[in-house]
Regions:
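Primarily membrane-embedded glycan-assembly and transfer machineries that use lipid-linked glycans
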Residues: 1-133, 154-295
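Hydrophobic transmembrane alpha-helices
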Residues: 77, 136-150
């Protein structure tokens, strides 16, 4: 077994142990599983949206189906819930980076992994969604606006993939709505009242949602036209309704989309990408001159 695999496994186990041990008692600083605690409280309560304002501790903002999938975990203790939940972001990170880049990925996303948010799961859904479009339902039924990545299928006229993504989402909503219609009626209200609501919080990128969204749209369109899949997770990150610094973790999803499984491959991608970017910038004046001449 390569030594890098062992280091990756040890780091994953050590991180999991730290998250589980440090989550109890809840509220100490620096705490772990802060976001996961919101899911746990919503799971135990009768009203999942009793706390539903961005910036408020333990605010739950995702669709009812998210809690319905977590239903079996309501019967375990808080620490038991964390023990189960903490496996998911670590597994997602391992999927996106592979064993050789796991330590780098963990260093870049440790706060997000420890907090228990779903950005890395969003990243997995995006990567998997190129092959199995139904995976986009996870994006649409949690963070919602990163679903702007579906423009990839629109621009490329991959209508079958788009329909699979939308129909799968509709089917999930139909089943879930039958179980909790009241919660589904409230969820859109929760979303509209919280979009971009990160003003004044130190942990949020100070760029309003409506400023970020056009760049996300343009990036997906450009990426789709030039067959650059790595643009989709970056656009999804830009389109997050509330962009916390932890949301930058979605960028890790670019690793498998550019074929980077080792440090050497990642370095090569970065070097070649930089050269391409410089070349594009240098070509701008020439293109503008041609357009003026043609006009």
């Amino acid at each position: 077994v390569p030594i890098t695999y062992l280091f990756a496994l040890l780091a994953a186990v050590a991180t999991w142990v730290f998250i589980v041990l440090w989550c109890e008692p809840y509220g100490r600083w620096p705490g772990t599983a802060m976001d996961a605690h919101a899911y746990y409280l919503a799971l135990l309560g009768t009203d999942p949206y009793s706390i539903a304002h961005v910036g408020t501790p333990n605010a739950y903002l995702y669709s009812p189906i998210f809690l319905q999938l977590l239903w079996p975990l309501q019967f375990v203790s808080w620490q038991g819930f964390v023990a189960a939940w903490a496996i998911l972001p670590l597994a997602a990170l391992a999927y996106l980076t592979g064993p050789r880049l796991f330590l780098l990925g963990l260093a870049l996303t440790l706060a997000e992994v420890a907090g228990g948010n779903i950005e890395l799961l969003i990243g997995v859904a995006i990567v998997v969604g190129f092959r199995w479009p139904a995976a986009w339902s996870f994006v649409l039924l949690t963070k919602v606006t990163p679903g702007i990545g579906l423009l990839w299928f629109v621009v490329r006229r991959e209508w079958r993939s788009l329909m699979i993504a939308l129909l799968a989402t509709a089917a999930v909503v139909a089943v879930s709505f039958a179980l909790q219609p009241d919660a589904w009626i409230r969820w859109p209200q929760v979303l509209t009242s919280n979009t971009g609501a990160t003003k004044g919080t130190w942990a949020a990128v100070p760029i309003p949602f409506l400023y970020r969204l056009p760049f996300a749209v343009l990036l997906v369109i450009w990426g789709a036209r030039t067959s650059r899949r790595w643009t989709v997770p970056i656009a999804a990150m830009l389109a997050l309704p509330a962009l916390w610094y932890g949301g930058l973790a979605i960028i890790i999803a670019t690793f498998p989309l550019v074929g980077a499984k080792t440090w050497t491959e990642l370095r090569h991608v970065l070097v070649e990408g930089w050269k391409e970017l410089v070349g594009e910038v240098k070509a701008v004046p020439e293109r503008l001159a041609r357009r003026r001449t043609a006009a």
